[in-house]
Amino acid sequence: MRIRIIAVGTKMPEWVEQGYAEYAKRMPRDLAVEMVELPLAQRSKNSDVAKAMEKEGEAMLAAIGKGEQVIALDVKGKPWSTEQLAEQLASWKMSGSNFCLLIGGPDGLAPAALAQATIKWSLSPLTLPHPLVRILLIEQLYRACTILQNHPYHK
């Protein structure tokens, strides 16, 4: 099974890169995780945020692989406990499907990207900075894997 994280934003701070890399290297070999970074659309004081989000959404839709199940990370999505995420992960593994997780930019996900998602998942009711979401997401995926493997990390 393959998980692709499709995220708006490149040139993350070093602490984000290090945090993400730490958990990505811990992932089990049978669960390949790939980060796909998309450029942030130009924004200025007078720019049209909706246009920027639309451009990011188009790039995101183009990056989604054929046959991938699409999960959008959105504050209005359904919250899962870590145990529920582990159950979902086990279900996805059993189905043999590949899937992608969408992380929006500073203004969130474009409506077109949200519409493409079969699942909308909320990591938290809090508004989180998109760089931090990368670390939270990969850590929760790793934690879910440890639950499935009865590894003591989750205890």
From Swiss-Prot:
Catalytic activities: pseudouridine(1915) in 23S rRNA + S-adenosyl-L-methionine = N(3)-methylpseudouridine(1915) in 23S rRNA + S-adenosyl-L-homocysteine + H(+)
Pfam families to which the protein is assigned, alphabetical: SPOUT_MTase
GO cellular component, one term: cytoplasm
Protein's name according to its UniProt entry: Ribosomal RNA large subunit methyltransferase H
Alphabetized HAMAP family for the sequence: 23SrRNA_methyltr_H
Record-stated family: Belongs to the RNA methyltransferase RlmH family.
Organism per entry: Cellvibrio japonicus (strain Ueda107)
GO molecular function terms attached to this record: rRNA (pseudouridine-N3-)-methyltransferase activity
Xref: InterPro entries: Alpha/beta_knot_MTases (IPR029028), RlmH-like (IPR003742), tRNA_m1G_MTases_N (IPR029026)
